[in-house]
C-alpha cells in the first residue's frame, strides 16, 4: 500500500497539506453544487450499500472516520444510528456541528486521530466507516488497523478509495479534475491510490476479513453515479472483524 507525503508532527498520521486543503473548502461542504457535489451524489449509494451489508443501522453505534462536513455521518444518524464522526480538519467539524444544529440531527463530532480513538475505545462500534479518506493520509495501513481495533468482534468495517492503475489516473485525475471539473485540481495524488489487493492485505493483517467489493461509476452524459462490478477506478470494500 503506497503512502502520501508527510505528517504534521511525529506520531500523527496526517498530511497537513491535506487538512489545509479541505479546511479551505469547509464552508461549502453542504452546498450540493460546490466542489463536494460528487460526495452528495454518491452518498445515497454509500449509505444503501452499508445498510444492505450490515443490516439496519437503527440503534447501532457507528463511527465515521474522516467524516469531513458530516454528509455520511448525518445520513447514518437519520437512519437511526448513534454516530460519532472524527476528522482532523477543525473547520470542517465546525461546519458539521452547525449543520447538525440546523437539521436537528445529532452526531458526536470529535477532532481526534483514529489511532488515538482506537486506544481509548477498542471494540466499541457496531459499524466503522472510512470513506474517501485512506488516499489522503501518509500511512493508510495504520488507519485500517485502528478501524479494526475500534470494531466489535463480528461487526463491520467499510472502506472506499481509489484503485491505482492507468485508467484510474485518467478518470479520477485527468477526467474528474481537469476535463469535467467535478473536483478541484490537486484533490488527489495518484501515488496515494490503493489497489484492492493492497487494501485487502492490510485488512487481513489487521484482523478483518474482506467480504465484498463494489465499484462506483459516473456517467458524464446522464451525470449519474451507480454501483457496479467495475472496481477499476472508485471502489468500496466491506470487511468483518
UniProtKB/Swiss-Prot annotation:
Alphabetical list of SUPFAM superfamilies matching this protein: S-adenosyl-L-methionine-dependent methyltransferases
Protein name: Ubiquinone biosynthesis O-methyltransferase
Biological function: O-methyltransferase that catalyzes the 2 O-methylation steps in the ubiquinone biosynthetic pathway.
Gene3D superfamilies linked to this entry: Vaccinia Virus protein VP39
Residues the entry annotates as binding S-adenosyl-L-methionine: 46, 66, 87, 131
EC code(s) of this entry: 2.1.1.222, 2.1.1.64
Pathway(s) per entry: Cofactor biosynthesis; ubiquinone biosynthesis
Listed GO MF terms: 2-polyprenyl-6-hydroxyphenol methylase activity; 3-demethylubiquinol 3-O-methyltransferase activity; polyprenyldihydroxybenzoate methyltransferase activity
InterPro entries in the cross-refs: SAM-dependent_MTases_sf (IPR029063), UbiG_MeTrfase (IPR010233)
Organism, as annotated: Bordetella parapertussis (strain 12822 / ATCC BAA-587 / NCTC 13253)
Amino acid at each position: 500500500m503506497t503512502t502520501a507525503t508527510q505528517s504534521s508532527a511525529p506520531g500523527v498520521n496526517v498530511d497537513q497539506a491535506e487538512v489545509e486543503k479541505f479546511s479551505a473548502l469547509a464552508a461549502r461542504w453542504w452546498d450540493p453544487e460546490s466542489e463536494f457535489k460528487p460526495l452528495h451524489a454518491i452518498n445515497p449509494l454509500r449509505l444503501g450499500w452499508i445498510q444492505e451489508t450490515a443490516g439496519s443501522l437503527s440503534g447501532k453505534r457507528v463511527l465515521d472516520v474522516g467524516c469531513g462536513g458530516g454528509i455520511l455521518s448525518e445520513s447514518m444518524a437519520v437512519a437511526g444510528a448513534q454516530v460519532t464522526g472524527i476528522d482532523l480538519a477543525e473547520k470542517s467539524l465546525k461546519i458539521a456541528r452547525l449543520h447538525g444544529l440546523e437539521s436537528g440531527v445529532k452526531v458526536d463530532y470529535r477532532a481526534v486521530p483514529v489511532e488515538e480513538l482506537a486506544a481509548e475505545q477498542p471494540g466499541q462500534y457496531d459499524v466503522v466507516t472510512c470513506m474517501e479518506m485512506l488516499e489522503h493520509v501518509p500511512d493508510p495501513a495504520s488507519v485500517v488497523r485502528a478501524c479494526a481495533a475500534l470494531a466489535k468482534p463480528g461487526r463491520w468495517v467499510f472502506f472506499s478509495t481509489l484503485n491505482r492503475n492507468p485508467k484510474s489516473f485518467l478518470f479520477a485525475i485527468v477526467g474528474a479534475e481537469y476535463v469535467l471539473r467535478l473536483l478541484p485540481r490537486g484533490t488527489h495524488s495518484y501515488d496515494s491510490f490503493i489497489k484492492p489487493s493492497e487494501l485487502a492485505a492490510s485488512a487481513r493483517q489487521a484482523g478483518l476479513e474482506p467480504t465484498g467489493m463494489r465499484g462506483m461509476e459516473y456517467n458524464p452524459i446522464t451525470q449519474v453515479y451507480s454501483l457496479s462490478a467495475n472496481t477499476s477506478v472508485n471502489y468500496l470494500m466491506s470487511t468483518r472483524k
